[in-house]
């Protein structure tokens, strides 16, 4: 008996809106998309949503560095993110932003409900404060020397060198990463979510049996160490939502970020008449809610998020599906090695379905890291998808289209073999449901091996050359096409584009239940190449582009740091005062007021301007290297200061009879000295 479709809401963690999507992000989004597509293939009602996490100090500061508003920056990043996800066929029903009216309304509502119910407290805390930028500094915006190993230039929360964790106040010689100033301690009132009040509820939720064992075990460790109140506020300046009823106080980004799931769904509900927000989020909802996240944010999703929802009168997630990190070639992704690969860079060179297949082949339901070994990636995709699966169609389609006008045989001659393929449906379905995608792929490729073994044994290419074997040729080739059809129905959640091309070739929509019966007397279309092999040269080109991107990014970062360092220096830092001289030496220099009678460019000279100067009854010709800073017509008629007793110097372009005084580091940053109009040509400068 048919059961009612399940109503499911699925989310991915919200990418932060200050950078590009990379292949580490794509693991989660591909994993979730495969699960979502499987559920849809089985007839379930799934809404798949995401958004950009668009608040916080890093976004505010990066926008300042770029000279644009945070709103402009997050809009551009959102456009890039959505383009990348679309490129990988991530089938979101809605992609929104935490910087939205829906999210502001929901964040305020949840906060006020928590406050009304006694779950919000406040107290004064002391924090490091940048006196130049007049802002409190998050841990990652303080740098200094590690208190344990003494490594320099370490962040305020942990040391990259020795792994020690600490408070920013523990750093030796701390400096603001924003301005370079030495931070000071300053008091401020902050607001806290009283997480310990939810300990019994969270323990019960943990013992429900639905969470991954690794997550449940980690939560037990946190319970044993004691739950702490959670600081949910930040002081101005801050890019985010102001806390209702407070001045210059903002929600910490991690309060409104998970509420972004609700905000994105609310936005989707506003676009559609068939969705009811409360049906999915009310406390007694019978719909299903699942979050796909990385292991680095388990703390927020398994403790704070369900507690916030419960305290504000909303339902909790059915489960939080956690995955590990992505490594490349057995190591952490590296920009210098070109293995820190952006999604857009990958799409410039390779088919997204290749990565979807490879990730699926290695994914399981545990919190294991996944290694993207690029050599294995090439070999596995070419071996499995091209040689085993797609080749099954290409080996048989030509006989059907050329010899039988594209028509499959009127009867199916291998029912036992076909039933073996169909019998695997329940096993593969269970593996998809439980996110054991790697095992599902192994089941599918094992079936592909059996299908190819059958074709090898029947050898249709031999039958095609023998007289009187026409019917057998059609029947054998039809079996091959039908077995390929079943395999592609099973692979449809993983490789939707290949499935779509297969549907066009078969002249049929692939459904899970529809392949239970083979196609007989069915007309297919002319076979076209369905899938291309991975060319190792394209993988190499992707790595090279990643290296180039990293080099450009590093150069820009170094330039920005140099400019920041330069801006923090005084003029004396840049150009220290020269050694002392005796007064007589200074008195020997005769400086006079001069009026610029004329000024002109010197042909074939890159830096020089030619001046005629009136120094009070005498005219002097002087050459000065300030062409990069001034146009000649800007200077004519102005007063300036010259060294009048400098020995004349014969130059290529004529005799220079003195020196005009100017200040500045050079280039366009030069300024001639201009005395007040009361000064007259010829007056001595004392």
Swiss-Prot record:
Family as reported in the entry's similarity comment: Belongs to the class-I aminoacyl-tRNA synthetase family. MetG type 1 subfamily.
Main function: Is required not only for elongation of protein synthesis but also for the initiation of all mRNA translation through initiator tRNA(fMet) aminoacylation.
CDD domains noted in UniProt: Anticodon_Ia_Met, MetRS_core, tRNA_bind_EcMetRS_like
Pfam families for the chain: Anticodon_3, tRNA-synt_1g, tRNA_bind
Single Gene Ontology MF annotation: ATP binding
Example GO biological process: methionyl-tRNA aminoacylation
Species of the source: Aliivibrio fischeri (strain ATCC 700601 / ES114)
Protein name listed in UniProt: Methionine--tRNA ligase
PANTHER family: METHIONINE--TRNA LIGASE, METHIONINE--TRNA LIGASE, CYTOPLASMIC
Domain tRNA-binding residue range list: 585-686
